[in-house]
Amino acid sequence: MAGGIKAWPEDERPREKLLRRGAPVLSDAELLALIIRTGDSVTGRSAIDLGRALLQECGDLRTLAGATVSELCAVKGMGTAKATSIKAALEMASRINSERLMICSERFTSPEQVYNHYHYAFRDRRKEYFMALLLDGKNRIMREIQVSEGSLNQSIVHPREVFNPAVRESAAAVILVHNHPTGDPAPSREDLEITRRLREAGDIMGIRVLDHIIIGDGRFTSFVSAGLL
């Protein structure tokens, strides 16, 4: 449809559609258009055109969520302001999911539960993220701690980064969770050594390391299930 969105019939404009019928009826491109807000005068693309171009470039929302600001700006008509608005909106969605997990009163009784709760939060990450889940005596989440970002090594993942918060929260145990951006959840030598050091530190402090879950692409490794912990 030619022309700017304001020239469109009212019932076809994303904002009016949302107000009348609710957000679920909007397409992905229309939702992106509301985040982008304006089109680009140089290319003549409307906000919906830009949303469609982003989806065509990335393929789907999952890939879009993992795109960098620079990659978003590579789409003609996208500038820094539009790209950062998209990144902020997607980050908020990720945090909402994390908050939902944090208030969960369900006990973690299996590695599958941990994976099912966290794989959405980790699957689009292009760097390694290492997280510690602080648990109470009934294995319920008290708090999530992001320990490091980037390639794991012993200087970054230090026992104090895990156990200082655990002591402050009076945690009874911890579960370690991190991702492999390659999609292969097989533990590396560094993973094994870091887990050993954290387990030993936990034993000294009376805070058990219940498991270490490595999240890959659609699969995971549990150190306990694999006999590594």
Curated annotation (Swiss-Prot):
Gene Ontology BP annotations: proteolysis
SUPFAM superfamilies, sorted: JAB1/MPN domain, RuvA domain 2-like
Q: Does the keyword Protease apply?
A: yes
Q: Please tell me where Zn(2+) binds in this chain.
A: H178, H180, D191
Give yes or no: UniProt keyword Hydrolase: yes
Task: List the molecular function annotations (GO) for this entry.
Answer: metal ion binding; metallopeptidase activity
CDD domains annotated for this entry?
Answer: MPN_DUF2466
InterPro entries recorded: MPN, RadC_JAB, RuvA_2-like, UPF0758, UPF0758_N
Ranges for domain MPN: 107-229
Instruction: Kindly state the positions of the motif JAMM motif in this protein.
Output: 178-191
Kindly give the Gene3D superfamilies that the UniProt entry links to this protein: 5' to 3' exonuclease, C-terminal subdomain, Cytidine Deaminase, domain 2
Q: Which domain of life is it from?
A: Bacteria
Which keywords does this Swiss-Prot/TrEMBL entry list? Hydrolase, Metal-binding, Metalloprotease, Protease, Zinc
The entry's family comment says:
Belongs to the UPF0758 family.
Can you name this protein? UPF0758 protein GSU0386
- Recorded source organism is Geobacter sulfurreducens (strain ATCC 51573 / DSM 12127 / PCA)
